[in-house]
Amino acid sequence: MNVERVVDHSAIRTNQVFTITLLALAFVLAAPAISGITGASMLLSAAAPPLGLFTRMYRHLLRPAGIIQPRVVPDNPEPHRFAQLVGGVMVTLGTLLVLAGVTAIGWALVLVVIMLASLNLFAGWCAGCTMYYWFNRLGVPGFSRSRSEAAR
């Protein structure tokens, strides 16, 4: 049985907007608490997408109010979850480095996540998704979905 796999790209874009906004605010205000909460939310979203703070705001507030319309397309969710995991790890590590006094490297990691999320939001290129599909092509265990499966 061939079950179509779909992803709501509006939910992903909403996550990116919240991530970019909160991380930029954390950087400008030099507020590692904000980046820490954002990183934790990203990690939770990667582990259990329905529980992610930004996903919940989209599903229970923004979408029902008609502020954002769903855009459900054939796609694999795993690469997006992997990208969220990579971003969450980088933000969390960056936050811990800032708290440990290694501020330049810590904030640099946060800024990299801002740049990559912006690249995905504005240009449609997901670095974490690309990494996922590379790992799939290399046969790395756990990276079982190929790009062609999303198009079926």
Predicted regions mapped to residue ranges:
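Membrane-interfacial helix-loop segments of redox and metal-homeostasis proteins
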Residues: M1-R152
